[in-house]
Amino acid sequence: MSDVENASLPPAIFIMGPTASGKTALAMTLREYLPVELISVDSALIYKDMDIGTAKPSADELARAPHRLIDILDPTESYSAADFRRDALREMADITAAGRIPLLVGGTMLYFKALLEGLSPLPPADAAVRQRIEEQAKEIGWEAMHRQLSEIDPTAAIRIHPNDPQRLSRALEVFFISGNTLTELTKTSGDALPYQVHQFAIAPAMRELLHQRIEQRFHQMLAAGFETEARALFARHDLHTDMPSIRCVGYRQMWSYLSGEIDYDEMVYRGVCATRQLAKRQMTWLRGWDDVCWLDSENPTEALDKVIQVVSA
């Protein structure tokens, strides 16, 4: 698309970044300066009754700056990138029709990619192939399956954690069905996003600062009642670690603790480590992202001014 054609499209703003980088705070402050409406781009915030462990904005914050696509599903339900794209496009159209600017904020980079580039023509799921993969995983473990993916599709293996059997299984399944890797197929995108998108990524300049923030926030969640929240979910007896909701960082480790597999201190240690690993994967995505303006989360005023300057130009 030419610059002239792009300039004629309605504007949209992406605020992306790793967990605990200050994305939400920036987005909420921007609402005071620009005619924006917020859309959450977070695969954990979609779930009801999962508030503390997902660092969901508080009721007061949501009253001040409402977020769309938060609290839309029960934790038993799944939600794909295709589901997100459909819902986000609907919300963006609604916001644009009201004469305001969609501001999409979050850290689920797969959702941003699906929205920006469209969905790729991936083969449908094949139950027989998936069963063979799961049977092999039971024999050799998901770590070994991840090494297998590293040989087949190293790019996908970097982005998919060995402890994410759903995405790992899907990447292998795509290859076994089509003979093409997930990375190859996702280069063939569908419909591009019909908006002039201003893309920003926010993170501390030093990785150590992000690690400190992550550890501090995990302890704040625990102090705020994360264990009580997780116990209520655990007591439902209809949730388990094969579900995307319970695989969210923090909840998976809390589940192991509540199941008696690990003690409290180990749960805290693993929870912090898993969150740091998530942030590392998010940063890997962002470093390969095109046309993104980087913001320093340690200078929030400067970050705010930069976004306003770019969007208002």
UniProtKB/Swiss-Prot annotation:
<protein>
    <recommendedName>
        <fullName>tRNA dimethylallyltransferase</fullName>
        <ecNumber>2.5.1.75</ecNumber>
    </recommendedName>
</protein>
<keyword id="KW-0460">Magnesium</keyword>
<feature type="region of interest" description="Interaction with substrate tRNA">
    <location>
        <begin position="247"/>
        <end position="252"/>
    </location>
</feature>
<dbReference type="Pfam" id="PF01715">
    <property type="entry name" value="IPPT"/>
</dbReference>
<feature type="site" description="Interaction with substrate tRNA">
    <location>
        <position position="130"/>
    </location>
</feature>
<dbReference type="GO" id="GO:0005524">
    <property type="term" value="F:ATP binding"/>
</dbReference>
<dbReference type="InterPro" id="IPR039657">
    <property type="entry name" value="Dimethylallyltransferase"/>
</dbReference>
<dbReference type="GO" id="GO:0006400">
    <property type="term" value="P:tRNA modification"/>
</dbReference>
<feature type="region of interest" description="Interaction with substrate tRNA">
    <location>
        <begin position="42"/>
        <end position="45"/>
    </location>
</feature>
<feature type="region of interest" description="Interaction with substrate tRNA">
    <location>
        <begin position="166"/>
        <end position="170"/>
    </location>
</feature>
<keyword id="KW-0808">Transferase</keyword>
<feature type="site" description="Interaction with substrate tRNA">
    <location>
        <position position="108"/>
    </location>
</feature>
<comment type="similarity">
    <text>Belongs to the IPP transferase family.</text>
</comment>
<comment type="function">
    <text>Catalyzes the transfer of a dimethylallyl group onto the adenine at position 37 in tRNAs that read codons beginning with uridine, leading to the formation of N6-(dimethylallyl)adenosine (i(6)A).</text>
</comment>
<feature type="binding site">
    <location>
        <begin position="17"/>
        <end position="24"/>
    </location>
    <ligand>
        <name>ATP</name>
    </ligand>
</feature>
<dbReference type="GO" id="GO:0052381">
    <property type="term" value="F:tRNA dimethylallyltransferase activity"/>
</dbReference>
<keyword id="KW-0067">ATP-binding</keyword>
<feature type="binding site">
    <location>
        <begin position="19"/>
        <end position="24"/>
    </location>
    <ligand>
        <name>substrate</name>
    </ligand>
</feature>
<keyword id="KW-0819">tRNA processing</keyword>
<dbReference type="InterPro" id="IPR018022">
    <property type="entry name" value="IPT"/>
</dbReference>
<dbReference type="InterPro" id="IPR027417">
    <property type="entry name" value="P-loop_NTPase"/>
</dbReference>
<keyword id="KW-0547">Nucleotide-binding</keyword>
<comment type="subunit">
    <text>Monomer.</text>
</comment>
